[in-house]
Amino acid sequence: MSRIGKRLINIPSQVTVSIKDQVFSVKGPKGELSKQIPYGIQVVQQNDHLVVERVAESLLARKLHGLCRTLVSNLVQGVFQGFERRLEIQGVGYRAQMDGKKLVLNIGFSHPVVIEPPTEIQLQVENNTNIIIKGIDKELVGKLAAEIRAVRPPEPYKGKGIRYLGENVKRKVGKAGKK
């Protein structure tokens, strides 16, 4: 049995859950999400808990058991609390600002980089160097954070670029020079 898959998922009182034809739907104070559950996996509601079970003992079902449990847990947590990812910009003259719903990055290119988030995601900029990405879908929040970071990832010599808050960038020593 999967160690992750056999753990129970608590359902907060403000969250309603429905399971119909292998589609798991959850509704909470922050919004509504649904996910297709693969064949061989079943989600069962027991009082105020959810249990993810394997219907079939196939290799695929055993592989997907823990994954489905984590995805269902993320859906429940997303509609109840939401998810947040923070990025920081380091570098002289590097800054970010909001233009309506769009994020405008001035990060050393000859032109500003404009990023338009999906409708489910909210972006905020704190003091021109910190970007906050909020949403109810953990996958979308992480994907957008990775896309923003990929515009100018931190370089190893000076550490300039966009990084996750608290990310440790391995630094390299520059060349030794003439003697």
Curated annotation (Swiss-Prot):
UniProt-listed Pfam families = Ribosomal_L6
Enumerate the GO terms in the molecular function aspect: rRNA binding; structural constituent of ribosome
**Which SUPFAM superfamilies does the record cross-reference, listed alphabetically?**
Ribosomal protein L6 (SSF56053)
User: Which GO BP terms apply?
Assistant: cytoplasmic translation
Do you know which InterPro entries this protein is assigned to? Ribosomal_uL6-like (IPR000702), Ribosomal_uL6-like_a/b-dom_sf (IPR036789), Ribosomal_uL6_a/b-dom (IPR020040), Ribosomal_uL6_bac-type (IPR019906), Ribosomal_uL6_CS (IPR002358)
Q: Name one GO cellular component term.
A: cyanelle
**PROSITE patterns, alphabetized:** RIBOSOMAL_L6_1
Q: Say if the entry is tagged with keyword Ribosomal protein.
A: yes
The subunit field of the Swiss-Prot or TrEMBL record says: Part of the 50S ribosomal subunit.
Cross-referenced PANTHER family, in alphabetical order?
A: 60S/50S RIBOSOMAL PROTEIN L6/L9, LARGE RIBOSOMAL SUBUNIT PROTEIN UL6M
- Task performed by this protein: Binds 23S rRNA.
Protein name (record): Large ribosomal subunit protein uL6c
Which species does this protein come from? Cyanophora paradoxa
Tell me the gene name. rpl6
